[in-house]
């Protein structure tokens, strides 16, 4: 449609951008890396008509897609609380997060995801244009967490299979990964790393804790 083409031609006017310092929800203090550096993220919320279009894409296309029980971010009736619950009482725990999760999801990966949802190349291209900015997935839009979940789905399934084989509980809340068990599973950490790396993502070593 002509209106959508005009909007895409002026995408820069439909986004805001700022750098935010991460704070701990419980204490209100800045989150820091082990070396004392304050954690930051770039927020890029969409505005006006683009936000409305993205909300429609989310509600009509993305939200109805069923995701594994292990996925808790951006899923109705799931939260960071439901993400933590399955790990209660487990003796051994490994927590880590995905480095630059949103920026690592580029235009091509989003396009491939829409193709995987059986959209024609023409529509997949339009949907990708409407949900990415500066050739990557922006953090802070209605569609980004849902798209990120779908891009990471193949990796999720591999991690779920690995964990099921070894009696490990696995959950993911957006870019935070948690693994736990009653048994020591240190010997499985390399396999976890390999699966994440093969999926085209990186674990943040500064945020990994066993």
Task: State the predicted function of each range.
Residues 1-15:
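Amphipathic alpha-helical blocks
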Residues 7-8, 69-74, 126-128:
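Short coil/turn segments at secondary-structure boundaries
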Residues 37-69, 102, 136-162:
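Conserved pre-motif C helix in the palm subdomain of viral-like polymerases
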Residues 86-174, 178-210:
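Conserved polymerase palm-domain catalytic core
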């Amino acid at each position: 449609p002509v209106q959508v083409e005009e909007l895409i031609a002026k995408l820069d006017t439909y986004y805001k951008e700022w750098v935010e310092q991460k704070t701990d929800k419980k204490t209100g203090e800045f989150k820091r890396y082990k070396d004392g550096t304050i954690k930051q993220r770039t927020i890029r919320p969409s505005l006006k008509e683009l936000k409305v279009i993205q909300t429609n894409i989310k509600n009509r296309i993305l939200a109805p897609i069923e995701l594994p029980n292990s996925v808790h971010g951006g899923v109705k009736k799931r939260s960071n609380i439901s993400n933590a619950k399955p790990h209660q009482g487990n003796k051994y725990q490994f927590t880590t997060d995905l480095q630059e999760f949103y920026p690592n999801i580029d235009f091509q990966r989003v396009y491939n995801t829409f193709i995987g949802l059986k959209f024609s190349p023409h529509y997949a291209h339009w949907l990708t244009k409407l949900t990415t900015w500066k050739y990557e997935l922006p953090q802070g839009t209605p569609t980004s967490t849902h798209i990120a979940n779908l891009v990471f789905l193949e990796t999720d399934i591999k991690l779920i299979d690995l964990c099921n084989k070894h009696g490990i509980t696995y959950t993911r809340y957006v870019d935070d990964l948690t693994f736990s068990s009653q048994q020591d599973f240190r010997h499985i950490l390399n396999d976890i790393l390999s699966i994440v790396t093969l999926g085209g993502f990186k674990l943040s070593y500064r945020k990994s804790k066993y």
